[in-house]
């Protein structure tokens, strides 16, 4: 269940088998003869079928992605071409199956699922959405928070640094833990799925410091476990902790939507009090149950796609709770259909209530100079880049410190998220006293700095 889908034996095996079978099939087609004089050679027939199928696939994928915007964002040309290539491959092998007989036909039939599987793995490698076989079926290997003992904060981060210099740190594991937990919906009554949390080594000691918090939100469709896995959270945080005496932020990944196909708009609406859940229930629970710092400067919210939108609408509305924003590939406004439809279905016709949730409006109304925005977008996601620039301008007008990053070679995908959050973690760590940044943002290899 934990075998990787984006690297290693699974994709290599599938791609390898597909390539070998395809080569054998092409040789078989080349050696075949037309049954009747005047008919096209079977290989030519298959090639024509591939071209026609690929062209049709390219057109349909482009229409779905960029014209009708079925998924709300463009799929990006690498994905569109991968899908078109896969459909071309299917067209080729189906035509081969029709023209061939015996073992060669059987090979062509077997190639159909192999080509489809290779195409799916190719698309997944571009997005980085499903990291393991287990993520396809919602499997998570993580234990419950109730399976371990977590102690209350016994010192500040500064005290921890002092003990580290003296060589008198309390015992702790070499790596942190990812755990699941049901966070009570005491104030919101919002129906949420299990949350995920990452506790760094320092948080697992018997005398932990009061640590900063990153409250991170997945996209929609998505889930807390998807963010943990696709965001490579554990490995990123463990690598940071290894360089900082076991210190890293505690990561909270609550569920902002209730289910994969639902969009809560991260607001208190007729369809659930998501804002109260995220900013009251989750925060109060963490401050009561985990060794976390209390001040707003020590709290950040971040997210991908819809989770990034939630970040830019919620953080400025709650400056008493959050001091930093780390959105990636976010939207200009909460989106689930037209504005008129959302106003009616979510806000009972109250347009003002919806407008208050639009990030630039929220930033202008209640954003403060004490807050800071660290944001990024994939190079191929032009819409998200435009959104980022607009929101960044609003943040500057509110007096916020603003950093904008572009991730070359990525689009609306988890590769962009990982690339932005790596320097984002160092930035937030310096901001909260965990450790100083050892290089400038321009020295990080996977990002380009706009501001």
List the model feature ranges, each with a label:
Residues 1-451:
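Non-catalytic cap/lid and distal C-terminal segments of serine-dependent acyl enzymes
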